[in-house]
Amino acid sequence: MNLRLAVFDLDGVIVSTDMFHFEAWKRLFAKRWGIVHTPAAEELTKGVARFECMKLLAHYYDIHADDEELRLAAEEKNKIYQQLLMEQLSPSNILPGILQTLALLKERGVYTALASSSRNAPFIIKRLGLEFDYCVDPATISHGKPAPDIYLAAMNHFGVSAQECV
């Protein structure tokens, strides 16, 4: 196999931001509804888009609110999350081996792409000083994960086949 492209997700692969998400949800639920957000509830949110998380958690906590109120709450959560990132995100949040892996791929001439569904991804990678040859904009993707669209967009950008990617 001739490896030409390595495609990475962000959260849980490049960087650990779980604690920031948990804290943001915790603050939101305490402020808006007087609810103590739990780690058990947090497990429901792994890999799920923000508004879908809000709907799942509203159901979990038996919160009765219309979609507009939930959408506003999800946006408030994101503002809290972004503030936490501004205050606390540092290179110590980069997962072990990532910097070495990215350097090795660059040295070997393998393209790197970030395929994250997080709209906060550009801020996070800039803040951490990470560089990718291409970052897929999730706003340009028709179908979110687990559909392959975001990965196909990275492959199409470089004109490579699936056999040339990891």
Model feature map: region roles:
Residues V48, R108-G109, E131, P138:
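Structured helix-beta-strand junction loops
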Residues P91, R119-V166:
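Substrate-recognition "cap/lid" segment bordering the active-site pocket of phosphatases
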Residues I98-R127:
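Substrate-recognition element of Asp-dependent hydrolases with the DxDx(T/V) motif
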Residues N2-L99, L104, R108:
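N-terminal helical cap/lid subdomain that shapes the substrate entry/recognition surface
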Residues P39, D67, L114, F132-Y134, ...:
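A generic structural-conservation signal
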